[in-house]
Amino acid sequence: MISSVDHLIIAVNDLDQATNDYKKNFGISPCWKGRHNEFGTRNVLFNLENTYLELISPHEDGPGTDFIRPLIERKGDHLAGIALGTDNVELVKENLAKNIDGVEITPGQSIKEIEGKKRKWKTLFLPNIL
């Protein structure tokens, strides 16, 4: 059912500063700088050997900002999530929905800041009870 660790998500308060810090630590530049208009967040991606690291920060009003801003205020910059990959998100949803209420698939999109290029995916947010 789960096929990979797709990526790690680090919530940061200052995306530009964190980008510079991780750039120095990894010795590589990010491959993507974008925004999630529907969530109100901005992000930067660093490609690693078989996964990637996503830095995400509050930017504008939206559910993503509403979720991560209080976490950053409480914990500072921190590991906020692990995205797992699957070949069949609908099957995963079906199996989880047998025991957990409110499991829904949400479309996601990031728009690259300079070129306007888009990345799209499906997300299945798991409740905090797990």
PLM regions: where:
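Short, extreme N-terminal leader segments that mark the start of a protein/domain
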Residues: M1-K33
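Vicinal oxygen chelate
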Residues: S4-N13, V44, E49, F67-L130
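Generic "edge-of-domain/loop-turn" microfeature
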Residues: L15-Q17, L53, G62, V89-L91
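Short acidic, gly/pro-rich beta-turn/loop elements at beta-sheet edges
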Residues: N20, I56, T65, V92-E94
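Structural motif
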Residues: F26, N50, I100-D101
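Conserved short beta-strand elements that form part of the metal-binding/catalytic scaffold
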Residues: S29-L71, K117-L130
